[in-house]
Amino acid sequence: MPSTKNANGEGHFPSRIKQFFRINSGSKDHKDRDAHTTSSSHGGAPRADAKTPSGFRQSRFFSVGRLRSTTVVSEGNPLDESMSPTAHANPYFAHQGQPGLRHHNDGSVPPSPPDTPSLKVDGPEGSQQPTAATKEELARKLRRVASAPNAQGLFSKGQGNGDRPATAELSKEPLEESKDSNTVGFAEQKPNNDSSTSLAAPDADGLGALPPPIRQSPLAFRRTYSSNSIKVRNVEVGPQSFDKIKLIGKGDVGKVYLVKEKKSGRLYAMKVLSKKEMIKRNKIKRALAEQEILATSNHPFIVTLYHSFQSEDYLYLCMEYCSGGEFFRALQTRPGKCIPEDDARFYAAEVTAALEYLHLMGFIYRDLKPENILLHQSGHIMLSDFDLSKQSDPGGKPTMIIGKNGTSTSSLPTIDTKSCIANFRTNSFVGTEEYIAPEVIKGSGHTSAVDWWTLGILIYEMLYGTTPFKGKNRNATFANILREDIPFPDHAGAPQISNLCKSLIRKLLIKDENRRLGARAGASDIKTHPFFRTTQWALIRHMKPPIVPNQGRGIDTLNFRNVKESESVDISGSRQMGLKGEPLESGMVTPGENAVDPFEEFNSVTLHHDGDEEYHSDAYEKR
């Protein structure tokens, strides 16, 4: 189809699709070698790993929640993990400026970014070829999620000055169409003849009836998830602005408290991280990485950050309080510690949507498990705990795939997220014992495919109340992961699972990561599996969740387990630091000419989200 260009020689594309892909990214080349990663735990110092007769590389494991262990040990020579591709256009970086520290690097000098092939853009054939009007219709079908990465210029390959690239606006190059394919992508205008194979279009046949919508209460989601919905300001609060109510969680370097803001009376979950412990355990970069992900993410299934600031001894992340507690605890209260297949499909869909967004942002989550999934008071899920997440190397451009029907109302566009992660591999040995993928155990490096493996384990656990490869000890569990087939109990009283569900689990738990579902086109592979045929992806957050938490009073923490606190953090007595770590009352502190503040890159900001004022107003009138 001939392209239409404006006076500047730029083609046109529906503006809503541009908004869908609004992010930019960058990579900064420099040399630094990360220290040995340490074990994540509730306590205890890390120790080096050692070989065992079983041949597995070992680390010290610590009990987490249900006696499942979390492993965080560096394996081999870690590859480069470059600076996150968060947007220069993102309000957070527009306010703060680009960070000077590459938070995620655990390796040596970064390798050259892989070449990105030209993306061939094809369209439906014959009479199904979309017109300009149907392109606008296609744009309307897209569920607009703010901060979703941009298709053009997502990564930059030649930043000679070491700075991040400028804003990666969706380029106005012409949208190409042909008569021999059912895919739509973005044409890369290069003089060479490179082209990539078009992705097969998902089959949209058989979409079921729309599930009944949830009756929206005043406390349901009201956030505006658009690219302009976040306003970033200098931090407006400090430790003295909050009253501590109760400890609701703890880890090896910090604790999570339910707090109430004195001025507004709003409840928040405040993550308090000890600077001393982070230095001791070499986890500073993880805290900086988590802040960056939280501050730049804007998605209904990812926990919201409102304030970040620091005192002389602590870092503070003030986040949305999810009164439903851990999804793990909700599962434990169900008969058989499991839920029906239809309910598991709903939560698997929400997790898939969250992972799709993270992959578009260039992040590999790497720690999916029920303990890291929180239930919003509306019953929808929210992913939390991003300290183990990893940033990918510069990758390619996402390709949009439309259904065979072209403009059919039942044919929703999907996006190839795999290209955003490129061929990035990391050698870090991280994860939860029963959720670790085979390639992580082998120490051969892993990619974003580990997130789809953990999704398969999660679905299995939701259905059967246990993980599929659990052994009597850690080595037995690892051996089962590497060698055993997936067991589907069929004895009397065992859950009755459909063949489509078993098919999805089998494909997600393929031991060869290159053949695993999601290895070809990322989340689109999962979303187009027949198991999700009746799932209305664009309407998930407006549907009624299977589990709606009992609220009680907001401060009752009914859905959280009791956590014993050995040493309480005095929030109100902490001495607040300035925007870049200097004590407020003392001006710029220079402890030494060559001294470097390791927490200088932790930014103190307040984030305002459109719709929250009305939401909080209703919430606290009902308390």
Curated annotation (Swiss-Prot):
EC number: 2.7.11.1
Positions with biased composition (Basic and acidic residues): 27-36, 170-180
InterPro entries: Kinase-like_dom_sf (IPR011009), Prot_kinase_dom (IPR000719), Ser/Thr_kinase_AS (IPR008271)
Region (Disordered): 1-215, 569-596
Active-site residue numbers: D367 (proton acceptor)
Annotated Gene Ontology cellular component terms: cytoplasm; nucleus; plasma membrane
UniProt-listed Gene3D superfamilies: Phosphorylase Kinase, domain 1, Transferase(Phosphotransferase) domain 1
Disulfide linkage: none
Stated name of the protein: Serine/threonine-protein kinase nrc-2
Organism: Neurospora crassa (strain ATCC 24698 / 74-OR23-1A / CBS 708.71 / DSM 1257 / FGSC 987)
Lineage of the species this protein comes from: Eukaryota, Fungi, Dikarya, Ascomycota, Pezizomycotina
Gene: nrc-2
